Swiss-Prot record:
UniProt gene name: cinA
SMART domains linked to this entry: MoCF_biosynth (SM00852)
Protein family per UniProt: Belongs to the CinA family.
Pfam families attached to this UniProt entry: CinA (PF02464), CinA_KH (PF18146), MoCF_biosynth (PF00994)
Organism of this sequence: Streptococcus mutans serotype c (strain ATCC 700610 / UA159)
CDD domains assigned: cinA
Name used for this protein in its record: Putative competence-damage inducible protein
Cystines in this chain: none
Amino acid sequence: MKSEIIAVGTEILTGQIVNTNSQFLSEKFAELGIDVYFQTAVGDNEERLLSVLKIAKERSDLIVLCGGLGPTEDDLTKQTLAKFLKRELVFDKTAQERLDEFFASRPTSMRTPNNECQAQIIAGSQPLSNKTGLAVGGLLEADGVTYVVLPGPPSELKPMVNKELLPYLSKTSEKLYSRVLRFFGIGESHLVTLLHDLIAEQTDPTIAPYAKTGEVTIRLSTKAHRQKEADSKLDKLEKKIITIDNLADYFYGYGEENSLPQVVFDLLKEKGKTITAAESLTAGLFQARLADFAGASDIFKGGFITYSIEEKARMLGIPFEDLQLHGVVSAFTAEKMAERSRQLTQADLAISLTGVAGPDSLEGQPAGTVFIGLSSSKRTMAIKVLIGGRSRSDVRYIAVLHAFNLVRQTLLSHKNLV
């Protein structure tokens, strides 16, 4: 289980107080075998806390927020988390009774609407009672992630953790297991639409989609006593997902840290194939990604960056008049770039990328138009990809992903194309 601790409070960032809560929680979690992967401090600001929660949700299974439960205007933790999860705040009866007792015993103390907020929890939460203060804590699960809300003062947090949170975590013999499925070539909204029925009916396991630049991931999460039990439940759900329409065509791998370039690199090594590339608009990004992996020299000997029309003719030997006739942004040029780079390096496969990164059009082609060529000893072909409404850097980045995906599809094809 990946856990993350978020300390909320501007006074932590300004150095007015030392964040001892995170150290205390990390120590206690370690005793339970819960790994703390991240610690974050954020000020009392809704927008910044929302951004931190968005990041935490994508990388952690257990998120613990400390602080921001008090009666002042800048105590926004519960309200912000409720907004993030699209849930309402509701009153906890026990916490309300504690408020009543507190002010009944102090008739001179003024009870304000802000005090009432201390007795609220997020709908669906399990309350964590506060024996040394007024702000109730809470624990809830949403989209495969467990959220815990704790008060900031150590005199309140420590008893709540020791008496409420730790017993809950330790007595829960079931652990949270997750599996990440990675998809390329399909948008998040389209994927969510296809999975609508499964998402609407989800209980355990749960399905949580995440959009990334150029791709989408789905985290499947379940609770189980052991890995084998979890795998059985996750296998069944994964099979349901992959068999919906043509989702299997977009699925390329597993894992939080995996990537399309990594999958292609592993496939090339597994099949003993070599690859080269000739790049125009991406200016070497495809080749750079290959070189990121140890052992790249086994499958990649070198390639070409032919940014201008002159270099396409000079380095690759493509007749200049042919390039002028067909244009550099064309299927013809993409095919010739791939074919010539393969012939010159004697690689098994060659990829080429030529197109319009933007923001201006080129040769009548709008920004985001990309032609990707692929050449093997069996055939040479090109595909056209439209990556509209993106920044120049995004167009180049996504174009490289499309190139890797084309290689992946070719290597996995049953038509013996390599």
